[in-house]
């Protein structure tokens, strides 16, 4: 899905102020996201679906642009108890409404993740939430001023449901740089509502030879907050591998 116009040829992909949904992996000499550009992916239907990869010698995301695969992961995990947050890199928070509830187990690789976040069940309150999707970036020089996000959904306030887990962000580059240092890389769990738990954090792994102006505190796999702190638990943080 392309909203507006983009510039692409065999060598370069320049997205200027528009949104692009990728259905498969792409390779260019140069990729640039400028002036509010967004790259996303379709929602996955299978935990074994291949991760979409973007490959470029030079890759730039400016301060107004982002790659966003939030909520593009899986629907609810059959292991998940009702009202509990979903698990991925970290365990989802459990509701205290049901004394016997236990969080679903974590899944995926810490060092080279390719797994999707799961969503949580919302029985009697509508459909499930959806976990964060998965994206891989391979580049020679990757300049990141904007955002890469693979967060889990949180339910609408009326749903009273558990939240989804964060997804996966895998970056494999020669040089990762930022002129401003104001970027965000996030694969965090969504926040719960009412008696429900927060989603577990996802997984981020970054392989690099050089860092330039990279503040690692801006790389996040937070667990989601419980809906009501007295009646549910927070999601656990996910994993970050550098």
What name fits each language-model region?
Residues 30, 34-35, 40-42, 46-178, ...:
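Glycine-centric low-complexity/flexibility signal
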Residues 1-17, 22-23:
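Boundary/junction segments of secreted and surface-exposed precursor proteins
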């Amino acid at each position: 899905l392309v909203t507006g116009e983009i510039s692409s040829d065999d060598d370069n992909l320049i997205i200027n102020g528009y949104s692009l949904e990728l259905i498969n992996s792409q390779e260019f000499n140069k990729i640039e996201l400028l002036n509010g550009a967004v790259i996303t992916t379709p929602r996955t239907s299978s935990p074994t679906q291949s991760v979409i990869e973007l490959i470029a010698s030079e890759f730039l995301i400016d301060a107004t642009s982002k790659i966003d695969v939030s909520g593009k992961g899986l629907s609810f995990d059959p292991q998940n108890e009702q009202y509990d947050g979903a698990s991925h890199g970290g365990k989802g928070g459990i509701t205290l409404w049901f004394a016997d509830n236990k969080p679903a187990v974590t899944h995926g690789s810490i060092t080279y993740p390719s797994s999707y976040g799961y969503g949580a069940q919302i029985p009697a309150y509508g459909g499930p939430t959806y976990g964060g999707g998965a994206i891989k970036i391979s580049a020679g020089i990757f300049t990141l001023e904007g955002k890469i996000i693979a967060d889990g959904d949180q339910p609408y306030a009326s749903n009273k449901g558990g939240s989804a887990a964060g997804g996966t962000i895998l970056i494999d580059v020669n040089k990762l740089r930022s002129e401003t240092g104001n970027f965000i890389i996030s694969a965090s769990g969504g926040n719960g509502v009412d008696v429900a738990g927060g989603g577990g954090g996802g997984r981020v792994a970054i392989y690099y030879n050089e860092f330039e102006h990279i503040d690692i505190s801006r790389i996040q796999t937070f667990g989601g907050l419980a809906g009501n702190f007295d009646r549910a638990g927070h999601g656990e943080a996910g994993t970050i591998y550098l």
